[in-house]
Amino acid sequence: MNVETIETPSLGDRSYLVHDGEVALVVDPQRDLDRVLSAADDAMVAITHVAETHLHNDYVSGGLALSRRTGATYLHAAAEVLPFDHRGVGDGDVIEVGSLTVRVVATPGHTQHHLSYHLTENGDGKGAGAGALFTGGSLLYGSVGRTDLVAADLTDTLTRLQYRSVRGMIDSLPGDTRFYPTHGFGSFCSSSQGGDDSDGTLAGERSVNLALTIEDEDNFVERLVSGLSDHPAYYAQMSPMNRAGGIPVDLSPAAPVDPTELLRRIHRGEWVVDLRNRRAYATDHVVGTIGIELDDPFATYLGWLIPWGTAVTLVDDTAEELVEAQRQLARIGIDRPAGGADGGPDVWGKDHDRASYPAIT
């Protein structure tokens, strides 16, 4: 069994391509499918199955689009009522993916119908074949997924389910099973940031994971819920979009915006976002633009701040960074920027009022 990790550091998430050298299962894919398809091409495998651990709250899934593009079977929790073609699965179900056996494990907590997937070679589940467990937003490295994203009145119930789910996996599967979470790498879907002490096995979590080191369920609930931080406002849009199935993403370049039109948009109070680093923005920027540096948290913070559905125009020094920003925004459902301009403020900011901020070095 081969596990290829597809990182999305901008959201703190991972997707996985799991294969036997011929056919593959993809777990929790993001919308920009070119990365997944490239990984499959590099491994020279055919994608026959796509599996969702849950309806995601931090990104728009690419699962349905990937299944339609490849003809793969799309696995989703049978308990979810969904309007698109998929295969509903539940606890104990078994799916064969080439020489790999996939066993479905119900792990409610992060969401009501959350699933994990335990993969073994030839179905033996013994020794070196203890397999790989894909845990989504359930068991994370040194932590667990947060439990307050579905509804406030369900938080207590989901937290208790999370505690029981994690302990159930640990008790029922071999200790040397390696596990692969989707969240927990900076994602706000994690209840806390952990993982430094995790060795990536179920046995290794016994001494480092809050759900396993706290023996009293009530104490765990109090500790986890009291430690939950705010989460991005755009999260409220993700589950409904995923429940509808999402739409294929269009990553073609945004329409160019000339300096005159850019000024009109600024004067109308539209969101014109300068992607340059904060020092460059502080040194020289066009009055009325909003500086949000293009780094890993870019999409998360823009999605947190902008009123949902508001048009956004992107400006930067290079066309390449406009393309990257567009890709990051598409992952959270902001599909098509209203336009873009590159070349720096001396080009797109020509004849506009400019400003600077004092900076300390």
Please annotate each region the language model reported:
Residues 1-46, 117-120, 125-136, 142:
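Conserved beta-strand hairpin/beta-sheet module of binuclear metal-dependent hydrolase folds
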Residues 18, 28, 54, 66, ...:
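Divalent metal-coordination and catalytic microenvironments
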Residues 26-28, 46-56, 75-79, 106-109, ...:
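Active-site neighborhood of phospho(di)ester-bond hydrolases with catalytic His/Asp-centered motifs
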Residues 29-30, 55, 79, 111, ...:
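Active-site metal-binding loops of divalent metal-dependent hydrolases
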Residues 32, 63, 68, 72-74, ...:
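Hydrophobic, small-residue-rich alpha-helical packing segments that form membrane-like cores
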Residues 33-75:
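Active-site metal-binding motif and surrounding structural segment of the metallo-beta-lactamase
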